[in-house]
Design a protein with these regions (language model features):
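Catalytic machinery of carbohydrate-active enzymes
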Residues: 1-304
């Protein structure tokens, strides 16, 4: 969702070099962004302050002489490394009262996440030109072939992503029934935390058995992808794969799959989006009432 910001920076500043400080678990995806020169893997545990480690990294980056840091997360701790690196221009949203840590501050406005980030390419208060550049990831055809061979895939296959680490309110419960209707080899993808979601679904279950980069390459070779609102959904969109994205407690207007090859299924219930991890009303209608037939209809429309 942040890649349109990077593309817009390259448009506005020809010749600019962009390095990306990213968590290790997403670094492999960031390295496939054509706008990025170098990815620096952040050595921090999720949610941990690790003040000394942030200071050490900041002092090391000081030697690179960066002109500007754009801080995307809203947390206080995420602004520490650019501050310790003495980067002269440090911009981002106010977030957790980051006065001083950042010196070019933006006020949050309601918007889709891609637009939210793209605003950081303009002075505060100025809207970026639209439409925004579409996200895209680089994958060579040989990498796709090698990944399929590595996991024993010989013919066309569909990728299903039944997990969503955010919580049960984002997980559609009928992937098993869908897989039984497809008439094509099925590959299940997700992280180790998604293993329970893949239980009982017929197909080549690779959930928790691939790296993120391997999953990316398998998605790049898929005939189509069906997923919940998840990180793999956004990867499929950036790869331009035909896909159907299923939304329950979240809002496809806020975090859509940014691709013309994407279809969205969302029931528009009065209680949705609630953004809850577990249905606060106990009925889970936003996903329970999303039928297999609805999803199959959208899959069929991908080839129309």
């Amino acid at each position: 969702m942040a890649q349109p910001l990077l593309a817009r920076l390259r448009e506005k500043l020809p010749g600019v070099e962009i390095d990306l400080l990213a968590p290790e678990w997403v670094a492999s995806v960031a390295r496939r962004m054509p706008e990025v020169k170098e990815v620096i893997a952040a050595p921090f545990r999720h949610g941990a302050l690790q003040l000394r480690e942030r200071w050490k990294l900041g002092r090391a980056l000081r030697l690179r002489g960066y002109d500007q840091a754009i801080v995307l997360p809203n947390t206080w701790k995420s602004a520490l490394v650019p501050f310790f690196a003495d980067i002269p221009l440090r911009s981002g949203y106010i977030g957790e009262s980051r006065y001083g840590l950042l010196n070019l501050l933006y006020k949050k406005q309601a918007a889709a996440m891609a637009l939210h980030y793209a605003r950081l390419s303009e002075p505060p208060g100025k809207a970026p030109q639209q439409p925004l550049p579409a996200p895209r990831l680089r994958v060579a055809p040989g990498e796709v072939t090698a990944a399929a061979r590595r996991f024993g895939l010989e013919g066309p296959y569909a990728v299903l992503c039944p997990g969503a680490e955010y919580g049960p309110a984002k997980r559609w419960p009928y992937f098993k029934e869908l897989a039984q209707c497809l008439g094509i080899e099925v590959v299940l993808l997700g992280s180790g935390n998604d293993r329970e979601s893949g239980g009982g679904i017929p197909g080549n279950n690779l959930i928790g058995k691939t790296t993120l980069d391997e999953a990316l390459r398998l998605i790049a070779g898929a005939a189509f992808v069906v997923s919940n609102d998840s990180g793999l959904m956004h990867i499929a969109a950036a790869l331009g794969r035909p896909q159907v994205a299923l939304f329950g407690s979240s809002n496809p207007e806020h975090t859509p799959p940014a691709s013309p090859a994407a279809r969205v299924v969302w029931l528009h219930l009065d209680c949705s989006p609630c953004y809850a991890r577990v249905c606060p009303l106990g009925h889970f209608r936003c996903m329970n009432e999303m039928s297999v037939e609805m999803v199959l209809q959208e899959i069929q429309s991908l080839n129309a």
